Amino acid sequence: MELGCPELLEPPEDIFSTGSFLELGFNGPASKVPVTRGLQKSEPDDFLNLFIDPNMIHCSETSPGRDSGVSEDPGSPAQQASSSPALYEVVYDSGTLQGTQREAGPTFGLISIQIDQWTPALMVPDACTVSGLPSDSHRHILPRVSTRAPAPPAAMPSCQHHLFLTDEEKQLLAQEGITLPSHLPLTKAEERILKKIRRKIRNKQSAQDSRRRKKEYLDGLESRVAACSEQNQKLQRKVQELERQNIFLMEQVRQLQKLTAQTSSRAAQTSTCVLILLFSLALIILPSFSPFQGQSEARPEDYQLHGVISRNILTHENVTENLESPVLKSKLEELPEAPTTNGSTKTHLKMRVKARPPGQIRGMVHTDEM
């Protein structure tokens, strides 16, 4: 492509005219554009080099009060754009300018051209596309025909947002045979599919978590069961040992009971024997200690018989005859020989019997026998 024709340096009137800008929704530029003043036909090396950077192409909506061109007329009406047409920034080399701009070094400028339905492939070949601008310390920027500030990040369209999918989401989409675009926005059907896939992934993760927790719980239970079984075995062995010790102690207790029974029976026998001996000794020794032993024996003369209330026993006539019998006589003779304290009384009675009648003798004998 030969860029030596000077006609390419002058923009056509139908594109940069005020009417065309008003139709596109922008304020028209001034009648005299400073870009057109300037290039010599004798300098073919400084012709316009057209570079279009795809990274500088962006979509934005025109604000209601923003001017699309450099206009000195304050009374020009501001119109709102009904749509968001594409805005392309063209980088050109203006070369050495005549008149007031005769400094050394080339100058560069930017022209913002709004194209409604043109495509970059029809405008500029791929060979003219570069990713950067040449750097130069002596650079002069020409006034723009149309200046436009870049849109803020919030106003940037969603076409620049990429859709990031995880490997698991990609795998599930591939299994279901569904392909999603890599850029946003998505349609409602695609959003539903993506939500469904993510819901499946969440359910899968929750199921895995529940299975993991269940496995951990079961492992903990198994370890506790093993520890409890081991402790139970130890306790069983200890119980068996204690049972053996208990049996041994019971045998010893039985033997001790037998020994204590024998010793207790022997002790009871000895104690009873000792008590019997003491009681017999007491019976033998106590009668010798009489309270009347220290007194003098009573004489027959000192003893006086007093009247005693006694029973009157009926006697038979044969009793008087029995008194004369030798048996009674022998008894009466034996009375003085008895070693008793009342021997004197019996002797006195015997002495008095002879002087009394037979009836009185029978009464005295009866009282003596009583």
UniProtKB/Swiss-Prot annotation:
Ranges in the topological domain labelled Lumenal: 293-370
Q: Which residues are glycosylated?
A: N318, N342
> Superkingdom, according to UniProt?
Eukaryota
Which keywords accompany this UniProt record?
Answer: Activator, Cytoplasmic vesicle, Developmental protein, Differentiation, DNA-binding, Endoplasmic reticulum, Glycoprotein, Membrane, Nucleus, Signal-anchor, Spermatogenesis, Transcription, Transcription regulation, Transmembrane, Transmembrane helix, Unfolded protein response
Q: What is its main location?
A: endoplasmic reticulum
Q: How is it modified after translation?
A: Controlled by regulated intramembrane proteolysis (RIP). Following ER stress a fragment containing the cytoplasmic transcription factor domain is released by proteolysis. The cleavage seems to be performed sequentially by site-1 and site-2 proteases (PS1 and PS2). PS1 cleavage may be suppressed by a determinant in the C-terminal region.
- What InterPro entries does this protein's entry cite? bZIP, bZIP_sf, CREB_ATF_subfamily
Mark the transmembrane ranges.
272-292
Compositional bias, Low complexity, is annotated for 76-85
Per the record, GO CC terms? cytosol; endoplasmic reticulum; endoplasmic reticulum membrane; Golgi membrane; inner acrosomal membrane; mitochondrion; nuclear membrane; nucleoplasm
Listed Pfam families: bZIP_1 (PF00170)
The entry's protein name is Cyclic AMP-responsive element-binding protein 3-like protein 4
Q: Which organism is it from?
A: Mus musculus
Q: Per UniProt, what is the name of the gene that codes for the protein in this document?
A: Creb3l4
